[in-house]
Regions:
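Conserved AdoMet/S-adenosylmethionine-binding subsite of the radical SAM
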Residues: 1-79
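A C-terminal junction/extension of Radical SAM enzymes
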Residues: 78-117
Length: 142
């Protein structure tokens, strides 16, 4: 365990609002571990510092190495995830925008704003530099 990991994590959280790109914070929810009202308040404090465009509340899945530490009972139902999301959303001045029951996920944010998708290229451009900022791209008109 890296003793400085939490400090680095907090620095990253505080850096996120200055980035000129869409930001998504993902919360992997584990029943009986991090879904209580106290945990929701703590998630909200971090989310308010990060000021993400979206928050993805996703249920833990009992696969891989995690099976050594957790059990099937730690997998929240979709209703559990929606309950968490509906309690978190007003604490971060957002709302539940979308959900997927088969994926056990909820999307929290202020609004869904589509961005243009460029035409596919059949070759690599000579300049593969840094992608342009997405928050300043024109919006897609419906």
């Amino acid at each position: 365990w890296n003793s400085g990991a939490w400090d680095q994590f907090e620095k990253t959280i505080d850096l996120l609002p200055s980035l000129d790109t869409r930001i998504v914070c993902r919360h992997t929810l584990m029943k009986g571990v991090n879904m209580s009202s106290t945990h929701i308040k703590e998630f909200a404090e971090l989310d308010n510092r990060a000021n993400p465009d979206f928050i993805e509340a996703k249920g833990y899945v009992y696969v891989g190495h995690s099976r050594e530490n957790l059990s099937m009972e730690n997998m929240p139902s979709h209703d559990d995830i929606l309950s968490f999301s509906n309690e978190l959303a007003p604490q971060v001045n957002r709302e539940v925008l979308s959900e997927s029951r088969p994926s056990r996920v909820a999307l929290i944010g202020r609004e869904i704003v589509p961005i243009p998708i460029p035409e596919a290229e059949l070759y690599f451009p000579e300049d593969l530099g840094i992608a342009p900022p997405v928050k300043k791209l024109p919006l897609v008109q419906n």
